[in-house]
């Protein structure tokens, strides 16, 4: 049995001109009346919704983020995600071939599929369902109650091991430099996706298999089989 763990943003779904990142910033500015500092996620200690919000709250107000505050932010953020998708649905799409590829791996009897995203679980469902990815068909691990990407993937692994004790191969599929860093730290096999074709971004960081999209399903499946941890 193989385990495939997918990231969401930039890996399965994409938005025009980083619309979802801008949506996160707009939610913050609406609630707190202060400018959101940056949507360059490299500037944050961990690229998860929880850590990003905690960091900005600490910087602006010198205090920790409460659970009720996080919940209120998430609700407003989800409202804006849904509104934007109703208003401009074509601005939010799958990475080319992602939906068909997910359906294919879900149909493979020797493969278990999971999601581990730096976003919150409910927001990930909104993004995937908008493009027709059946997010109810697999477990989604997100930043709910977790601050690091390692912790998110660990949750996904823990749940998978309840279903199957041993896997012949475990592969994480992601698009960002922090995905390379995380899988190297955890010594997980990795396949990179760079939808703009700039594969060197991840290759230069040590990723050995980087594709542009999922349009050639056989090439993607071959990459999964050959995947190894980033060097």
Where do the language-model regions lie?
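Short amphipathic alpha-helix with an adjacent loop that forms part of the alpha/beta core around
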Residues: 217-229
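Extended hydrophobic secondary-structure segments that form protein cores and membrane-embedded regions
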Residues: 6, 42-44, 140-142, 169-175
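N-terminal helical cap/lid subdomain that shapes the substrate entry/recognition surface
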Residues: 2-8, 12-100
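Substrate-recognition element of Asp-dependent hydrolases with the DxDx(T/V) motif
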Residues: 98-129, 139-147
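Short acidic-hydrophobic, aromatic-tinged amphipathic segments that line or gate anion-handling sites
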Residues: 141, 209-216
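Conserved Lys-Pro-Asp/Glu-containing loop-to-beta segment of HAD-superfamily phosphomonoesterases
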Residues: 152-180, 184
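A short, structured active-site edge motif that brings together acidic residues
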Residues: 40, 69-74, 134-148
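Acidic, Mg2+-coordinating phosphoryl-transfer loop and its flanking beta/alpha structural elements
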Residues: 172-212
């Amino acid at each position: 049995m193989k385990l495939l763990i997918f990231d969401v943003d930039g890996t399965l779904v994409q938005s025009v001109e980083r619309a979802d990142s801008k949506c996160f910033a707009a939610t913050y500015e609406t609630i707190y009346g202060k400018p959101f500092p940056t949507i360059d996620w490299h500037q944050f200690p961990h690229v998860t919704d929880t850590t990003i919000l905690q960091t900005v709250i600490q910087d602006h107000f010198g205090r920790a983020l409460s659970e009720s505050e996080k919940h209120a932010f998430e609700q407003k953020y989800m409202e804006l995600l849904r509104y934007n998708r109703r208003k401009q649905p074509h601005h939010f799409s799958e990475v080319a071939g992602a939906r068909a590829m997910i359906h294919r791996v879900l149909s493979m009897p020797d493969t278990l599929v999971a999601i581990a995203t730096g976003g919150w679980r409910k927001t990930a469902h909104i993004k995937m369902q908008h493009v027709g990815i059946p997010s109810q068909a697999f477990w989604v691990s997100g930043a709910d109650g977790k601050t690091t990407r390692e912790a998110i993937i660990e949750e996904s692994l823990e749940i998978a091991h309840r279903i199957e004790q041993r896997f012949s191969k475990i592969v994480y599929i992601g698009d960002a430099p922090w995905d390379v860093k995380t899988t190297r730290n955890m010594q997980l096999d990795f396949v990179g996706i760079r939808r703009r074709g700039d594969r060197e971004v991840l290759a230069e960081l040590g990723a050995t298999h980087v594709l542009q999209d999922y349009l050639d399903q056989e090439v993607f499946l071959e990459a999964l089989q050959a995947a190894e941890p980033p060097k």
